[in-house]
């Protein structure tokens, strides 16, 4: 068996990636989220495939086909709710994975980090298009509002929006193409994940100290396969509790009303995992400025390697930057809350303050804190 594992041209790739891979001996549970994201992706592709067997991407029948899946298909309700809540679990793991990367300075592995940002954009695009497919009120109006943001692009904006819509409004053509893209993107994401792993295995994993761990490595299997399996069990338990006991807690009641272009819901808002970006978008009165801020809220992550001023990699031994980091986490929670609130006083001013704080902490305060810590520790 060992000979096949190490000699077979295909199996040896798996062997070098998941079995004999040298891994730091001290990586904590924060390093579990990569494998959990892989599990989430697998769940989403499988449940999505079964949903696609019964779904029809036509404005006249899309809503009914989802109802049919829930009522008439064997365990259709379970597949549908696993897919809907699987997206939420996916984003919870994504945010924790990115948060871990920021805390421990993993962004210094630039290729891996940039690939991760591309993956984040791809997953967000996939989730957005998936939200449109049930063709409920929030699906329709969410698609209208978000795609309409592209009209803020000078000169080509309006043409671009109509090109994406396939007409003069969100309609049958839009739904059909969104279904096509929503189906193909997870497979593209899978390919990007392999590239992400390829880049990671070029440098090796980071660890909680942020120090070089070449002198202290252990094989990935059995140590981290067992550890990852524990993470998988915990995630699946949380996931099934959410899916079986509280399937609608993260959804919007408006999406149980069929899409109606003549009736606008009182509060148009995306799914919870986009609310922080939506709050940043709404906090700027100018349309183009809002769109730029929305894109920058994610793209600012690409600047992190350039903004790293500390002589240390991780925040483990850097209390000042640690404080900034946790303020940033609190700020993101505030933005998520604001994104779900109506556009009125005091929510507008809170959203604007939190948006300014978000960019200020990442681009100004954390680099300054890094320099201060260098001086305190005489690391210059």
UniProtKB/Swiss-Prot annotation:
Binding locations of heme b b562: 83, 182
Subcellular location: Mitochondrion inner membrane
Membrane-topology annotation of the record: Multi-pass membrane protein
Cofactor: heme b
Keywords attached to this entry: Electron transport, Heme, Iron, Membrane, Metal-binding, Mitochondrion, Mitochondrion inner membrane, Respiratory chain, Transmembrane, Transmembrane helix, Transport, Ubiquinone
Superkingdom, taxonomy of origin: Eukaryota
Stated name of the protein: Cytochrome b
Organism encoding this protein: Microtus liechtensteini (Liechtenstein's pine vole)
């Amino acid at each position: 068996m060992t000979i096949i594992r190490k000699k077979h041209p295909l199996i040896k790739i798996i062997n070098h990636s998941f079995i004999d891979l040298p891994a730091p001996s001290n990586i904590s549970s924060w390093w579990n989220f990569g494998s959990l994201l892989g599990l989430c992706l697998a769940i989403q592709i499988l449940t999505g495939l079964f949903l696609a067997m019964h779904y029809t991407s036509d404005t006249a029948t899309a809503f009914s086909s989802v109802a049919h899946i829930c009522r008439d298909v064997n365990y259709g309700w379970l597949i549908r709710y696993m897919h809907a809540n699987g997206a939420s679990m996916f984003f919870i793991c994504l945010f924790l994975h990115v948060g871990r990367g920021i805390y421990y300075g993993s962004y210094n592995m630039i290729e891996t980090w940039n690939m991760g940002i591309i993956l984040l954009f791809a997953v967000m695009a996939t989730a957005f298009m998936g939200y449109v497919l049930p063709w409920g009120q929030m699906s329709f109006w969410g698609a209208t509002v978000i795609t309409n943001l592209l009209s803020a692009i000078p000169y080509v904006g309006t043409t671009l929006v109509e090109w994406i819509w396939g007409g003069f409004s969100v309609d049958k053509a839009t739904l059909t193409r969104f279904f096509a893209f929503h189906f193909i993107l997870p497979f593209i994401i899978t390919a990007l994940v392999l590239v992400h792993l390829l880049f990671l295995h070029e440098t090796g994993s980071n660890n909680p100290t942020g120090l070089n761990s070449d002198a202290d490595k252990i094989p990935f299997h059995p140590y981290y396969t067992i550890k990852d399996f524990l993470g998988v069990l915990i995630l699946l338990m949380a996931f099934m509790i959410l899916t079986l006991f509280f399937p609608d807690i993260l959804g919007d009641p408006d999406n149980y009303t069929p899409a109606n272009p003549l009736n606008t819901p009182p509060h148009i808002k995306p799914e919870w995992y986009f609310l922080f970006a939506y709050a940043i978008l709404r906090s700027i009165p100018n349309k183009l400025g809002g769109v730029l801020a929305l894109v920058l809220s994610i793209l600012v992550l690409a600047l992190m390697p350039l903004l790293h001023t500390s002589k240390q990699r991780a925040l483990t031994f850097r209390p000042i930057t640690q404080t900034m980091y946790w303020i940033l986490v609190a700020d993101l929670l505030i933005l998520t809350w604001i994104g779900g609130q109506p556009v009125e006083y005091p929510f507008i001013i809170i959203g604007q303050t939190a948006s300014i704080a978000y960019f200020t902490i990442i681009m100004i305060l954390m680099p300054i804190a890094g320099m201060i810590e260098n001086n305190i520790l005489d690391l210059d």
